[in-house]
Amino acid sequence: IKYANTIISYIDKVEGLDESIKNEYLGRAYFHRAYRYLNLCFQFGDVPFVSKIIDRPKQDYKSTKREAIIKKLVQDMEFAVQHVPDQKDMTYIGMINKGACRQLLIKCYLANGEFQKAKEQADILISQSGYKLMTETFGTFSNPHPTTWNITNNVIWNLHQGNNKVIAANKEAILVMPNRYGSDSGIRTRTMRNLVPWWNATSISTPDNKLAVDRFALTHASYDASMDYNRTFGRGVGVEIGRASCRERV
């Protein structure tokens, strides 16, 4: 919200900026602010609405009515839909595009009880914006661990393959933000560490003080490919192989 407000507050002071470019980036800033505030309104109801840069310590925040915030978000997103370009007219993937703005405007209309307007915008998004539901297989198919988890080629699998996320054949993608390890777009997250322990660490023990999880090398005599969910689903987020002493608890 702070970064969005920075753009909103200062964009008119940028000398020599073309009006269409200014409105394009202003619309994107409105998107980012509206996206966060819509989530806050649904999570907490009335919240303080900060629409400008806070340049000094402030402790007297007062909540704004949820209904008033949503009405403001509707106005902002109507502007964004008008001025932010379609993805096909943009150079970069990952920046806010018109389709994403329209989708957020639909949600704002629904939150504001303007159901007919929401339907009209949804019809445009579905039928007139170049998007459609994928019904046939497409893109790259991979079946990397057939012994553990054999995959038959299908649309859902194709949709969730990293190589298929941003290709032109994927017509379901409205706003895609690539985040790939080792690339310029890679942003490391701590989701895995926040949700599960470092399960293959030798310091994790069962209540009876035994090693909690076995992690066998591929060449180990006890390695069983049919149980290797770690390599199949990714770093232990699937099913882990526990010792007999902790299986009942699992």
What are these regions (language model features)?
Residues 1, 99-105, 109-249:
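An aromatic- and glycine-enriched ligand-binding surface/loop that stacks and positions planar moieties
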Residues 1-44, 60, 64-68, 78-90:
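Conserved, well-structured interaction surfaces
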Residues 8, 48-50, 81, 173-177:
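Structural recognition of the beta-strand scaffold that forms the well-ordered cores
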Residues 40-49, 133, 183:
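Proline-centered turn/helix-capping motifs that create local helix->coil transitions or kinks
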Residues 51-58:
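Short linear capping/connector segments at secondary-structure termini
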